[in-house]
Amino acid sequence: MKILQICYKPPFPATDGGAMGMNSLTEGLLNMGHSVKVLAFHSKKHPCNIATMPKDYIERTSFETVFVDLDIKLIPAMEAFLLGESYHVKRFISTAMKTKIAEILKREEFDIIQMESIFLTPYLPLVRSLSKAKVVLRSPNVENKIWKRTYKATKNPFKRYYLKHLSLTLANYEKQKVNDYDAIFPVTETDAEYFVENGCRRLCKAVAVGMDTPEILPDVLEEENTIFHIGSMNWFPNVQGIKWFLDECWRSVKAASPQVKAYFAGRNMPGWLLNYDEKDVHIVGEVDDSIRFMTSKQIMVVPLLSGSGIRIKIIEAMSIGKTVIATTIAAEGLMYEDGKNILIADTPKEFADAVKKCLEDPAYAKEIGKCAARLIATKYNTDNIAKEISRYYKELLEA
């Protein structure tokens, strides 16, 4: 098959969860012998320098990128607010991207055009006018669910009202446009059920994100009595979750396990976190090698209060045998068993109890990690995921 993959941000280098999810599918489809061309947006938030990318990747994917200014602008935001339109979607409308898509589709024919976000839907009419390919939405999450959970956790009444507006306009947009695609492939069963319950009449199947276990782990000692979090801090649910953890959970965790130290890694750390000053809390910032960082620490904590889709950093940590303590929302979409391959904690006391149990009983924690690694190896193998979605693509083309 010949596939055009259109991405809302650069899938390579795969340094954050979203990029890892897109890139793993690219690699899996290429491994199967399919032809995959990658076209991606890049922005100030998600920059891309082709000159620094591996030549092999560029050649295999015929990689191209288009800049889009995603900075929030007051007047367009107010216009969208007054017109009841989704400002999230409007920010991704780009004349340069329209020109690039038209150029590609006039030059090449594709069997499948894979859109990596609902935010790319404004380009669907153009794609339909220039291509006979089946057009599918690979949905990493249900965007409006993220904002719904976010506004419900927001105390400022004005901010809460505006975030609610963003959530509702995005929900309406998703419901209106989802049937314009030939098929929808969310990454979780939860999201697939949401689309069907909200009117999706197209083929809608959950296809997980692939993650291969590294053959060789970094030669680094695991620091005892440590917990860690790693994630992009330009994603609001991560910021919200870490603030809640430090404000509401850390004292309970520290009281239960006085010896524990916490490490927080990720790009674009906000100023308040960089200036956070408390004993045994270490703000690491961006790391060059996420696997090396995770290998050097003991237990991952993922205290998300909002979000949708699947947390790829959890899958990455599980793949190397790390014990993960996460909220129910953070673990949403994973095929987990609480107490077997992950530990679920939704309150400060539950986090404190789980951390204490793992630190006091390392063998227990190690067993959780081993079971987690087995889960990822069997259920989230990159090539198996690519085979699954390829089977659905074949069905679409033969229908």
Give the predicted meaning of each segment.
Residues 1-64, 108, 252:
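N-terminal subdomain of nucleotide-sugar transferases
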Residues 8, 75-90, 135-172, 232:
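Acceptor-binding helix/loop patch of EC 2.4 sugar-transfer enzymes
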Residues 134, 164-167, 171-216:
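Donor nucleotide-sugar binding/catalytic pocket of nucleotide-sugar-dependent glycosyltransferases
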Residues 182, 295-309, 320-323:
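Acidic donor-binding loop of glycosyltransferase active sites
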Residues 206-296:
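Conserved catalytic-core segment of nucleotide-activated headgroup transferases in glycan assembly
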Residues 313-316, 323-327:
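Short hydrophobic beta-strand element within catalytic cores of glycosyltransferases
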Residues 342-349, 357-363:
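Conserved acidic donor-binding segment of nucleotide-sugar-dependent glycosyltransferases
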Residues 364-379, 385-391:
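A short, well-ordered alpha-helix in the C-terminal region of glycosyltransferases
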